[in-house]
């Protein structure tokens, strides 16, 4: 009886949670001007780690940008925007463009101090000099700022404008919109962005000179937020220190004290309590602009979800999260146990599917082919005598786990420092292509090869090509002792990121009208290329194992780092219950994170309860 009550409570909590999410107020707390000073840099990280800030805008033209880069790379969970800059407002510190653009600067070569006319700075505003402004120079400068940020900061997701730089004329507004699309970024602060992304800018609901006024006015704003709506609040944290005490412009002289107040506001426990009490959900700009759409589940699916959660509890499965996407919209999501919505989860061998995507992209760019010989990439790591089987080993053999090994050599990574050399020095008793043996070190070799031919680690190669277009951020991937991403394991992503990847595969590599992964590669990687058996066995055992094929999702065929499933589905999976399950006949994706040893039992519950309701 107690177990049934617990199970129903969990199910009710899920349904309540989904409804609450769809009706919650969502708030982005954005902090601007990172890079303009050391004080702003430190305060930005402080208000992210210890406060409510979720997105930060960085200024590549400023002197403290290199320090900002270092700090942001140490905090990959902080969402970053490029704060496009055409003005330099402070009296005692100035910044200049990255490119030669005479129409954008004053006689000293600095950006003008103001965007709009200011009586203290006659003739020194962008708008007062519009007649001489060249749009081509604006584009040139914006491109330089964007590319500098993208080169150094992986988690850049969007563009914003310093002092209105992204929308001060219709032509500039359209330019920014075009650049954002070209670079795969969202664009905030231009005309129409609030409507495009369905949010509302909010500020202080009253006086905000002192800290107490800031808190009272900001809490007033929080209390006026309506359920089901999304909001964006921005301000500029820094410290009241010796550095900031020298910073001012006419009309804004108390910069240091004011920005210390912003820092204190964003870290205020009183403010945090109001946010919790009112059920306000803090998100970042990446989520605001690239989150998957939500839709209330059908009655049939809601009932099935109830039964599924109850069955998970009864089976004592340690499920951390599950997300179901149907017809491109999230219809079922839940986090439990140690699973957290906004924290990346270890994916184990789900990592392999992302490595396969990188290989497909490298092939499409002419950097690789399926028939390339593995030994050609590592001439300095080969054994003294290269055998016939090793000589025959190709990229395709690595992808299909048909390397010629009879046993998985992956444990070598626990004792060896040079994993490429260790792999190449193993015995290859069979002809490659004749035996399936699950082999994580083979996937590592794919990662090493991609790094060889692209000059980039897997994660850096995938950011502009896959992660950024899908809005996947805060990516972490473990590395080998020689600095190569593990490839076959060690990737950390959020549950929604898994769902996005599944949806991309379901859509044949297309995302929002663009071909992100080659369609033919998606078809090949998700098709049965070779017969397969569960990890720990090799295909010599296949005749015996096939007697239970109707009940097993590990005997349906293997593609390029993906498994075929029953029900004409395919999947990425990782040890302990990590799944991306793509079900084309239902136009659906199921993503899970977990700590479940019996993964067949885990997927069986999905087939039993959720599949019929999709």
Question: What would you call each of these model-derived segments?
Answer:
Residues 184-190, 251-292:
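C-terminal domain-boundary segment and adjacent tail
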Residues 309-339, 581, 587-591:
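A short, well-structured edge-of-sheet supersecondary motif
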Residues 328, 345-371, 398, 446-450, ...:
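Active-site SXXK
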Residues 442-449, 489-510, 578-594:
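Active-site-proximal alpha-helical segments within enzyme catalytic domains
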Residues 365-403, 425, 454-489, 493:
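Active-site helix/loop module of the DD-peptidase/beta-lactamase fold
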Residues 44-50, 67-79, 97-106, 150-151, ...:
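Acidic (Asp/Glu)-rich catalytic clusters
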Residues 129-215, 219, 223:
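Catalytic domains of cell-wall/extracellular-matrix polysaccharide-remodeling enzymes
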Residues 472-474, 526-589:
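Active-site Gly/Thr loop motif
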């Amino acid at each position: 009886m107690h177990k049934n009550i617990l199970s129903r409570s969990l199910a009710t909590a899920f349904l309540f949670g989904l409804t609450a999410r769809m009706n919650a107020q969502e708030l982005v707390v954005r902090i601007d001007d990172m890079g303009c000073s050391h004080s702003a840099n430190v305060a930005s990280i402080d208000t992210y780690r210890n406060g409510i800030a979720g997105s930060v805008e960085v200024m590549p033209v400023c002197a403290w940008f290199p320090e900002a880069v270092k700090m942001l790379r140490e905090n990959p969970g902080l969402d970053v925007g490029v704060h496009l800059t055409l003005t330099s407002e402070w009296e005692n510190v100035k910044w200049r463009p990255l490119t030669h653009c005479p129409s954008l600067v004053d006689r000293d070569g600095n950006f003008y101090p103001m965007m709009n006319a200011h009586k203290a700075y006659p003739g020194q505003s962008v708008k007062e000099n519009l007649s001489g402004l060249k749009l081509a120079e604006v584009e040139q400068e914006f491109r330089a700022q964007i590319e500098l940020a993208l080169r150094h900061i992986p988690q850049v997701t969007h563009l914003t404008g310093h002092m209105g730089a992204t929308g001060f004329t219709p032509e500039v507004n359209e330019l920014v919109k075009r650049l954002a699309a070209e670079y795969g970024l969202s664009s905030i602060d231009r005309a129409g962005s609030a409507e495009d992304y369905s949010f509302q800018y909010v500020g202080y609901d009253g006086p905000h000179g002192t800290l107490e006024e800031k808190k009272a006015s900001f809490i007033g704003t929080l209390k006026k937020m309506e359920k089901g709506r999304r909001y964006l609040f921005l301000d500029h944290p820094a410290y009241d220190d010796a550095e900031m005490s020298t910073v001012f412009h006419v009309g804004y002289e108390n910069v240091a004290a004011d920005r210390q107040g912003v820092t204190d506001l964003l870290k205020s426990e009183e403010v945090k309590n109001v946010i919790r009490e009112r059920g306000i959900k803090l998100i970042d700009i990446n989520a605001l602009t690239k989150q998957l759409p939500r839709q209330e589940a059908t009655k049939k699916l809601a009932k099935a979800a109830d039964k599924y959660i109850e069955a998970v509890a009864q089976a004592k499965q340690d499920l951390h999260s599950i997300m179901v996407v149907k017809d491109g919209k999230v219809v079922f999501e839940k986090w439990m146990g140690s699973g957290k919505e906004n924290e990346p989860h270890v994916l184990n061998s789900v990592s392999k599917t992302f490595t396969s995507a990188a290989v497909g992209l490298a092939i499409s760019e002419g950097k690789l082919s399926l028939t390339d010989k593995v030994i050609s990439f590592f001439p300095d790591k080969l054994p003294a005598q290269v055998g016939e089987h090793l000589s025959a080993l190709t990229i395709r053999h690595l992808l299909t786990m048909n390397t010629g090994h009879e046993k998985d050599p992956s444990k070598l990574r626990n004792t060896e420092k040079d994993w490429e050399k260790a792999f190449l020095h193993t015995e290859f008793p069979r002809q490659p292509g004749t035996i399936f043996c699950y082999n994580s070190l083979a996937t590592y070799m794919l990662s090493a090869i991609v790094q060889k031919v692209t000059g980039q680690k897997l994660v850096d190669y995938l950011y502009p090509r896959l992660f950024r277009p899908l809005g996947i951020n805060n990516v972490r991937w473990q590395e080998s002792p020689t600095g190569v991403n593990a490839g076959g394991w060690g990737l950390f992503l959020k549950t929604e990121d898994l769902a996005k990847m599944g949806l991309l595969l379901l859509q044949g590599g297309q995302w929002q009208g663009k071909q992100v992964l080659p369609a033919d590669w998606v078809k090949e990687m998700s098709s049965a290329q070779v017969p397969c058996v569960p990890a720990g066995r090799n295909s010599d055992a296949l005749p015996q194992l096939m007697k239970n094929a109707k009940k097993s999702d590990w005997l349906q065929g293997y593609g390029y780092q993906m498994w075929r499933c029953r029900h004409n589905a395919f999947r990425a999976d990782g040890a302990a219950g990590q799944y991306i399950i793509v079900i084309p006949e239902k136009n659906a994706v199921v993503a899970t994170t977990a700590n479940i040893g019996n993964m067949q039992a885990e997927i069986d519950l999905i087939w039993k309860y959720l599949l019929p309701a999709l």
